[in-house]
Amino acid sequence: MASAAIYYHPEAYSIGGPKLMGRNAAGESFLRGFLLHTNTSEYWVQVEQQVHAQTFAATRKQLGQAHPVKVVDKNSLGALSQPGVIYYPGPGIGEHAWHRAAFGHGAYSLCGITHTTSSAGAMDSIAALISAPVQAWDAVICTSTAVKTHVEKLLQAQANYLVDRLGLQKLVLPLLPVIPLGIHTQDFVFNATQKTAARKTIDADKDTLVVLFMGRLSFHAKAHPLAMYQALEKAAQLNPSKKIVLVECGWFANDFIEKAYQSAAKLSCPSVRVVTLDGREAQNRTVAWASADVFCSLSDNLQETFGIVPIEAMAAGIPVVVSDWDGYKDTVRDGVDGFRIPTTMPGPGLGGDLALRHALEIDTYDMYCGHTCSFISVDVEATAIAFNQLFSSPELRKKMGEAGMERAREVYDWAAIIPQYEKLWDEQNEIRKAQGGSLKPLANPWPARMDPFTAFSHYPTKLLNADTKLTLNDDSLETSINLLNDYRALAMVNFAKLVLPSEDECQAILNALNRSTLSAGDIIQSVPAERHAFVFRALNWLLKIGILKVVT
């Protein structure tokens, strides 16, 4: 079974940097998994600087490996024909295909991998795969079915443009296999002594229910916590005799975001004690994993593509409550490992302005993520029901935790994942050797930008449409108005005020639904025609913050 040369830059494979992101954690975990589970005895590495090769060798030495490393740099790219495949820790293999062209398109194969696919840079690199000299023996690993669908949408949109612009008749695409990220499941096994000590650290006795969120604490770019807070409060009201603790183990980018979390939790889940741990510290992560009874991640963000943390929770034997969103659809079996909660998003055609603001750099990527996630809702009632089921049944928690642990070990441990990588690399070599002739390069157009609600329309459980029946979540119009005003005042809601409906428009919506149930198409008749699309989209924002609910 073949292995591959590894394109190595320390930043891509380390969690020690100043701005820890999911791709860093995934890269570090992959490298460790590769070094521990590869079948090769000959290591190749491509570097930009020789010092990086020394860092790679030191990493291997820490794992007890002493095999020599063969180093390739920009002055010796042709040597990559010896390992036959080069693995890059990102999707942008188009740039490297141009580098390869000097040595012949069939000199070696390229293999990349997706992380987020919603940023301008990621979409540019994916769209560029069509115009760059990428070949049928190249591959971009998609970490989930959801991200593969988005990659295919981007590629199709770019191909359509080239057909219209240049009369494109020939299309050569890389392989797009779905191979999930892996974890080291043994890292998440804790004994009874560790669990007792961890719960003592957060002042949780054996009868306290500990719910854990693990990851970046970023309402605009990771998982907006308002739905989780609201659902926990509902569950707390259903279990008045139980003490509930929410552990948020992560890190805030700044004081503004930290204060936004604090004010939202104070308003939305006053019955729940919130403990915040700095997730950049390994000891805090151990405390979080070892103390938790239930894990929750209600991701509602376009930048999420796989979501490794629920699998880590499963490896720790913790039942999970997650949104029915992106990669979670693949990893978490609803009703088996935990619960997947329905999500709703506006349909295609309602986000072109958001895409354009991002494309023209009026909005930063963070603001683009925040604006789009403002219109993506997670079903609070279903979340509360899931919490209540788990809170009420230690047996269910144990059953789901054990099922998740078994799945994590059998499906998502690197011992099971690395052989899938090496099988792919074998396939790439076989295709290249059979088909490796010279091919004409395609033209190089500027990449596409898509309406986010078109590009990601497959992420949610359902799409809001004109026939969707809506009503007020509270029977009282006055209460609904007061709640809306309270939520609008929250920093984590108000930050997106530029794309939210006016107070008059909100009042018109609430008045229309006072003591009645209407379709979304009928509701927007209460505002001027030129505002129909804007207000239609805003109905999903009102669903998101719990003012409206869907009537089924």
Residue ranges and their predicted role:
Residues 319-322, 332, 339-340:
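Short hydrophobic beta-strand element within catalytic cores of glycosyltransferases
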Residues 290-305, 318:
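Acidic donor-binding loop of glycosyltransferase active sites
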